[in-house]
Amino acid sequence: MVAAQAKLVYHLNKYYNEKCQARKAAISKSIREVCKVVSDVLKEVEVQEPRFISSLNEMDNRYEGLEVISPTEFEVVLYLNQMGVFNFVDDGSLPGCAVLKLSDGRKRSMSLWVEFITASGYLSARKIRSRFQTLVAQAVDKCSYRDVVKMVADTSEVKLRIRERYVVQITPAFKCTGIWPRSAAHWPLPHIPWPGPNRVAEVKAEGFNLLSKECHTLAGKQSSAESDAWVLQFAEAENRLQLGGCRKKCLSLLKTLRDRHLELPGQPLNNYHMKTLVSYECEKHPRESDWDESCLGDRLNGILLQLISCLQCRRCPHYFLPNLDLFQGKPHSALENAAKQTWRLAREILTNPKSLEKL
């Protein structure tokens, strides 16, 4: 048994050093190419409208606010200033979303975003995004990369297609630090010793973002109040949870396997599903020794089996907001197909670790 485990870990490490590192290098190169263009577009936006200031800065070889959706798809979060005159309200009526309401006694004129406040005093995510989309469309025509970049049509999101190869979504957002949403108040679960009080304090201090984007849980039934709502996102908090042991390596393996074998019709699975399942696996195996290098095979296998279970149940709860289903709106046939493919992949890796050389 120990010999079989060691063999699997050996082949996973080999796969990581060859395939995962190659994937990372290729994505880093793509990110540099994409960020040059996006920075130029955002510089042009700022000239037209100084309230939209580019926050796409490189720090320690990574760009703040940039998320990799897939090797050719990225999201750039554009942090806006001056949320201060609004109260953050998440009463759970819109899973995964919250609203920003003008604080009592505050005049509209005190806000930097006065013309985007609705009659009921809410700061409208949709109105801000609509204005931003117009500005980006104008900037694309003026910027120095205009020959290689164009807007993606037929969406209320701000999406750019670059060199016919990459798609980048630029999402206006507010950063919320020092507060924690009520809809995530149950976390951490009291009977689970992971992630420990110090890490919990770090994660909660990191806070979350409020994004102006279409909320998929409301697709097809968006009333005006709902389209004014902001989507909760915990990217930095989630990144903190992946620190230590072989967690990041495990996630890197899962992303690479997804890119190579689970990029399927209907796009049932993305990198975020993998990241979410790593967090759940950490709860199931709370001891640091469970994430030792020697346990890499067990952890990967556990996550793949959990993924199959989620696909078969057609439900993958968000880690911090369990009422939010990350498979919402995905075609059932696509989820079934993904379950079969994941099962084949898991069986192949477990019964014949050497097959990783071809995967």
UniProtKB/Swiss-Prot annotation:
One of its GO terms (cellular component) is nucleus. Mg(2+) binds at E73, E75. InterPro entries: Mab-21-like_nuc_Trfase, Mab-21_HhH/H2TH-like, MAB21L/cGLR. Its EC number is 2.7.7.-. A ribonucleoside 5'-triphosphate binds at R23, K24, Y63, E64, G65, L66, K248, S252, L253, L254, K255. It holds the Pfam family Mab-21_C. GO terms for molecular function: metal ion binding; nucleotide binding; nucleotidyltransferase activity. It is found in: Nucleus. Transmembrane segments: none annotated. Keywords: Developmental protein, Magnesium, Metal-binding, Nucleotide-binding, Nucleotidyltransferase, Nucleus, Transferase. Its main location: nucleus. It comes from the Eukaryota. Belongs to the mab-21 family. Putative nucleotidyltransferase required for several aspects of embryonic development including normal development of the eye. It is unclear whether it displays nucleotidyltransferase activity in vivo. Binds single-stranded RNA (ssRNA). Monomer. Homodecamer; composed of 2 back to back homopentamers. The protein may exist as monomer in solution and oiligomerizes upon ligand binding. This is Putative nucleotidyltransferase MAB21L1. It comes from Xenopus laevis (African clawed frog).
